[in-house]
From Swiss-Prot:
It catalyses: L-aspartate + H(+) = beta-alanine + CO2. It holds the Pfam family Asp_decarbox. Its EC number is 4.1.1.11. This is Aspartate 1-decarboxylase.
Length: 120
């Protein structure tokens, strides 16, 4: 049996930009994305705390420190300054769950890392 579980998340990131004319995705500061084990092209779920929207997109790495930019159609689901949660899931076998440790990255208002933990 396989279980879909939380793989990692960036908690309470602030949207720094929204680019309707870009071809989809969420641009995330590369250092921040990698601290959450998010790979370029990885599917993520976005939860907008301000308006309750939930939607899926994929990660691209950004060069700007603290950058969180929703692109394409996803740009219509956020406003600059909104607080979001970026979530990735993965599929695990029962045996893999013995060593299950999701990565939780907490950030401040500038999207700088406050803490990284492995507890749900």
């Amino acid at each position: 049996m396989q279980f879909e579980m939380l793989y990692s998340k960036i908690h309470r990131a602030k949207v720094s930009d929204a680019n309707l004319n870009y071809v989809g995705s969420i641009t995330i500061d590369k250092t921040l994305a990698q601290s959450a084990n998010l790979l370029a092209g990885m599917k993520v779920e976005i939860v907008n705390i301000n308006n309750g929207e939930r939607f899926s997109t994929y990660v691209i790495y950004g060069d700007k420190k603290g950058e969180i930019c929703l692109n394409g159609a996803a740009a219509r689901k956020v406003q600059i300054g909104d607080i979001i949660i970026i979530i990735a899931y993965a599929t695990y076998t029962h045996n893999e769950l013995e060593h299950y440790k999701p990565t939780i990255v907490q950030v401040n208002e500038s999207n700088q890392i406050l803490s990284i933990t492995n507890e749900v």
